[in-house]
């Protein structure tokens, strides 16, 4: 679950996803799932064949900062589609809202997209109808496992970011190279460590275990059998003993670092930037990290599919996609934005927008499901409901 407005995260349990179907993913040399490699049974939702007349309005569920008058007003003038925005604070809230059938589009993260696809809540997309989905979209955001199923695309990329290790360089005087400073019981910064507060954070523990306990056989942090999940929870309980606080509210995370209660822990690049203090540094540790990637997804019950397609195309342009990325604080999906101005180039450099080598180390949030997405067929993996239940045991 992801919190993207300055409110506390809701602790809502998601319905378990029970998947059946063919074997799972193939693996690339970097160990990430091959695009569209997951084969599972999902509802047969039709794809739009051709565009028609715009309906006059479009209802969108989005993260704060993704739908703003600075670009939505121009869209309305251009298309005649009035934009009605509903800001959501968590992925769970987005899933619930999309299941009402009242919204046409959602800016879904990877920890929501598989739930929406499996529930038949979103429709596959006809990419031929979206002109701005082209060669300028960064390769690392095309055909990803969290929004591409059975060879069909369900999402139009918006932006991405890594869950980085942030530290106070006046206290942590040597740049950390490992997550061990945040996970090990003997960390010299025990009692000054901050951790993310959500079930999906179990994947962060799994990433660390992939490097430190290879005998567990974890090859994808979102594909954990019961033994692997138990190991991740044990590590999280160990970390609980050295954590000063957990954060879901970005404002609280910034305050914790700025006030000195925290000196090291999980962060986003935009949060470090918002501290406006050069003593706060960040690093992507050698073990890699988790991360998030957002995409527009179309409701299977949309009353305004033409306006929705128009919005996905409009916001996919270099200028508008870049405006969204700069407004929120993330790497844009459209690399052409990086060449539009010196300011754009600086933004892209700060957020590693076109650095695929950087993002190859990032495991983007993906909904855990019972079918093992690492390709194993001889074991059942744990699903998001099990992760949610397990997370509740971490903090006691």
Show the residue positions of the predicted features.
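Periplasmic-binding protein-like
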Residues: 131-135, 233-239, 277-300
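Early extracytoplasmic/lumenal segment of secretory-pathway proteins
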Residues: 36-116
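Mature extracytoplasmic/periplasmic domains
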Residues: 299-368
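Conserved C-terminal helix/tail region of periplasmic/extracytoplasmic solute-binding proteins
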Residues: 361-396
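A bilobed periplasmic-binding-protein/Venus flytrap-type ligand-binding module shared by bacterial periplasmic
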Residues: 166-171, 207-209, 292-305, 323-327
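A ligand-binding cleft/hinge motif common to bilobed small-molecule-binding domains
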Residues: 112-117, 265-279
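Extracytoplasmic ligand-binding site segments that recognize negatively charged/polar headgroups
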Residues: 61, 66-68, 107-256
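Bacterial lipoprotein signal-peptidase II cleavage site
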Residues: 19-32
């Amino acid at each position: 679950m992801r919190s993207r407005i300055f409110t506390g995260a809701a602790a809502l349990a998601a319905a378990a996803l029970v998947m059946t179907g063919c074997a799972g993913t193939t693996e690339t040399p970097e160990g990430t799932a091959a695009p569209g490699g997951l084969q599972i049974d999902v509802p047969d939702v039709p794809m739009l064949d051709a565009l028609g007349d715009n309906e006059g309005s479009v209802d969108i569920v989005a993260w704060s900062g993704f739908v703003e008058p600075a670009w939505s007003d121009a869209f309305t003038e251009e298309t005649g589609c009035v934009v009605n925005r509903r800001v959501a604070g968590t992925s769970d809230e987005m899933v619930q809202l999309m299941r009402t059938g009242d919204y046409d589009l959602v800016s879904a993260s990877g920890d929501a997209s598989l739930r929406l696809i499996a529930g038949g809540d979103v429709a596959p997309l006809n990419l031929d109808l979206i002109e701005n989905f082209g060669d300028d979209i960064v390769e690392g955001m095309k055909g990803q496992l969290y929004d591409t199923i059975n060879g069909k695309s369900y999402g139009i990329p918006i932006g991405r970011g890594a869950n980085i290790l942030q530290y106070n360089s006046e206290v942590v005087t040597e740049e950390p190279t490992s997550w061990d400073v945040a996970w090990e019981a003997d960390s010299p910064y025990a009692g000054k460590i901050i951790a993310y507060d959500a079930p999906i954070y179990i994947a962060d523990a799994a990433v660390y275990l992939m490097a430190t306990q290879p005998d567990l056989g974890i090859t994808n942090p979102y594909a954990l059998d019961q033994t692997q999940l138990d190991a991740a929870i044990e590590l999280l309980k160990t970390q609980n003993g050295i954590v000063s606080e957990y954060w879901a509210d970005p404002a609280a995370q910034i305050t914790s670092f700025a006030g000195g209660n925290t000196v090291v822990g999980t962060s986003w690049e935009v949060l470090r930037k918002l501290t406006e203090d050069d003593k706060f540094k960040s690093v992507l540790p050698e073990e890699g990290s988790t991360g998030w990637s957002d995409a527009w997804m179309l409701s299977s019950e949309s009353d305004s599919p033409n306006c929705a397609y128009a919005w996905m195309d409009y916001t996919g342009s270099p200028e508008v996609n870049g405006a969204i990325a700069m407004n929120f604080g993330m790497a844009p999906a459209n690399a052409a934005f990086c060449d539009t101005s010196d300011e754009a180039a600086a933004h892209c450099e700060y957020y590693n927008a076109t650095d695929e080598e950087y993002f190859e180390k990032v495991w983007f949030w993906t909904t855990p499901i019972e079918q093992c997405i690492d390709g194993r067929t001889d074991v059942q993996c744990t699903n998001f409901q099990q992760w949610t239940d397990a997370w509740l045991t971490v903090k006691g």
